[in-house]
Amino acid sequence: MKNNYYNDKFTYLFEKHNIDTNNIKFLLAVSGGLDSICLFDFFLKNKFSFSVCHCNFNLREDSKKDLKLVKKLSERNNISFFSKNFDIKKYAKKNKLSLQAAARKERYKWFDNILEKNNIDLLCTAHHINDNLETVIYNLVNSTGFRGIRGIKVLRKNI
């Protein structure tokens, strides 16, 4: 591994949580954004065993471009690739949820399904500081109490 800031952070995180990267199969949730592409690059450079999944919620004009990018990166590097199109607007309306809550619920249900069906140990998602801030605000607005102030957990269950 190159000795740089991000490699050191990842290495520390894996060691802190006793994650043996040599004996674990990972599933990376890759959106096509910079944070998840960096995660993909890190796993690729370190030759970890991983597959990639991509959710297309069809909420932005660039959704199809993101899907093409992530699929192309995966195929070019012989990485197993999973993708799914979601009709989140319909699901959110039917279940009286915000788009964010509906997307979160549906994607994690799908992620769990992939993990189980493919005997994959751990899901990795990439987040930047704004994602964490949004989570804290969302949790505060939805009255989660002090637990919500902590934002996105570093590790929970198999995620």
Q: What do the predicted segments below correspond to?
A:
Residues M1-I159:
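Core alpha/beta nucleotide-donor-binding catalytic domains of modification enzymes
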